[in-house]
Amino acid sequence: MDKELFKEEQRFDQLWLKVPLYILAIGNVVLFAYGFYHQLIVGEPWGDNPMSDIGLVFATGLVFLIWGAVFFLFEKTKLITSIYDKEIRIRFPPFFSKEKTIPIQMIKKMEVRKYNPITEFGGWGLRYGFRGKAYNVKGNIGLQLNFKNGKNLLIGTQKGEQVKWAISKMVRAD
């Protein structure tokens, strides 16, 4: 039985990210709800060049659907990292719900490092950059894995010191 040394679950819960999204969503929904009400309930065309009633129903539904999907993704997306004595396991639902297992034998080098998510990977999330793949949701600290096959993976963490401790125990367990 593998011994779990570390586990972390991270979500996209940054206020600087949520506030603009909520403002945009509320603005879009209110605008289309007003247009829907004005044209279909009151009976007056909405705007200088109004779309058909069917087009407005479709567009309003699409706006609600898109924003619903965005908020669903933000609510359900989480990065789950587990470090065991002989492997690292990662899940990033809804992008991949099946656990990815990385045996220690595949890893050439691993270290906790500071990184720049924007310049190195183009932001947060499931990212691809010149230095390899990154799974991150916030911050600028990550577990850098360099594989024996030449590929690289960075896993973001908010608990760098705990990850350092876990990988030191992991290496000793091999």
Predicted regions, residues:
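N-terminal membrane-targeting/pre-transmembrane regions
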Residues: 1-54, 169
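A membrane-cytosol interface segment of integral membrane proteins
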Residues: 3, 129-174
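Non-transmembrane, membrane-adjacent beta-strand/coil modules in membrane-associated proteins
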Residues: 9-12, 90-151
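Short N-terminal helix-initiation segments at or just after the protein's N-terminus
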Residues: 16-28, 48-57, 85-97, 152, ...
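Canonical hydrophobic alpha-helical transmembrane segment
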Residues: 28, 55-71
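Glycine-centered small-residue hotspots that permit tight backbone geometry or close packing
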Residues: 43, 124-125, 156
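Short, flexible segments with low predicted structural confidence
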Residues: 52-54, 59-60, 78-80, 116-117, ...
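Conserved beta-hairpin
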Residues: 64-109
